[in-house]
Every structure is written in structure tokens, then in C-alpha cells.
A protein has these predicted regions:
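Hydrophobic ligand-binding cavity/cleft-lining segments
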Residues: 1-56, 175-178
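Hydrophobic-ligand binding "helix-grip"
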Residues: 2-4, 43-44, 70-119, 125, ...
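A conserved amphipathic terminal alpha-helix motif
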Residues: 2-3, 126-178
Length: 178
């Protein structure tokens, strides 16, 4: 296993390779958090993910771990360092089966809105391995586009949940930062 450095919430503002996305989801924070806990949902709305395996038993909490199989054969071993259902969660890579990054973390925040909707904030920060540091700035537009597609996939997935658990207002445009 290629070990990765743990990151903290402060690293999202410190690292150059950091992205922020915001959108409105047509479901309550509770329902969206259920989607995040459901390992079967991830490959549907995040096409780059082939499989999610929780390696810690429920109830999930800080310290919970999971393995995520990603297209291209990458397996990421993740540890959650924030777990506050239904409001926020964050994890960092403990390691990967391939030398992909030195460190990577993701932060998910769910803010309740009127009409049973949710403001979703997703932040991703990473440090490239030394040989990729010079190429990383050139890849930023492609990474941003790739991540925006994941957000759009989540919007579609949530919008198609059973009507009793979603709001009926139209989806909002994704805003990407970073």
C-alpha cells in the first residue's frame, strides 16, 4: 500500500490543488446523508467509482473507514475525520494501491434550505506526488470538469429519488471554484 499523509480541514484553504463546488439538491440533508452512507448509490451517481465498501461497522463515526474502487484500478483506503450526520463529513486517504497522490481529502457539507432542499458544498484538496507537481496545474481544468460531472450526477440521482422524499423545485446550476 502507498501510504498517504492525513489532511485536516485547514488544508482545504492551504493547498494549491483545492476545489470547491456548491449546488442545491432537491432533498433534505437527512436524505442526502443517507445517499452518502449507501454504498450501492456511489457507482450510480459518481461514475468514476466502481465500488464502495465500508470497512467499519455501523454506527459510523469519526474513525470510520471504507475502501473505494475507482475506474482505472485505483483503490483508496479512506478514514473519516469529521462525521456529523446529517450536516457534514470529511475523510482523507490513508493509502492507495497505486502511487496516485501524496494526500487527498474531501469535505461534504449539507445545509437545510426551504422546501426540503439542501445546499451541498463539496471540497476536495490533494497534494500530487513529486513527479506530478509540475503537471498538476495543467490538469486543473480537467479535474474541475471531472468533479463538476460528479456533482451533476448527484443532482440527477437525488432528483430521481421517490417523490415523497424530495422537493419539487427545479435544480440549480453547479458553481465550481478552485
Amino acid at each position: 500500500m502507498n501510504e498517504c499523509k492525513p489532511l485536516t480541514l485547514e488544508d482545504f484553504d492551504r493547498l494549491n490543488d483545492s476545489f470547491r463546488f456548491e449546488t442545491t439538491l432537491e432533498a433534505t440533508p437527512e436524505r442526502v446523508f443517507e445517499v452518502f452512507e449507501d454504498p450501492e448509490s456511489w457507482p450510480i451517481w459518481a461514475r468514476a467509482i466502481k465500488k464502495v465498501t465500508w470497512t467499519s461497522p455501523k454506527p459510523f463515526a469519526v474513525g470510520t473507514t471504507r475502501d473505494v474502487d475507482i475506474v482505472g484500478g485505483l483503490v483508496a483506503h479512506e478514514r473519516f475525520f469529521v462525521w456529523e450526520p446529517p450536516h457534514r463529513m470529511a475523510f482523507y486517504f490513508v493509502g492507495t494501491n497505486k502511487p496516485a497522490v501524496t494526500s487527498l481529502a474531501e469535505y461534504y457539507e449539507l445545509q437545510p434550505l426551504s422546501g426540503g432542499r439542501t445546499r451541498f458544498i463539496w471540497r476536495v484538496a490533494y497534494e500530487s506526488r513529486s513527479r506530478m507537481r509540475y503537471v498538476s496545474p495543467l490538469l486543473r481544468p480537467a479535474v474541475r470538469l471531472f468533479m463538476a460531472r460528479i456533482v451533476k450526477g448527484l443532482e440527477r440521482y437525488v432528483r430521481e429519488l421517490p417523490p415523497a422524499e424530495t422537493a419539487s423545485t427545479p435544480s440549480r446550476e453547479v458553481r465550481a471554484y478552485g
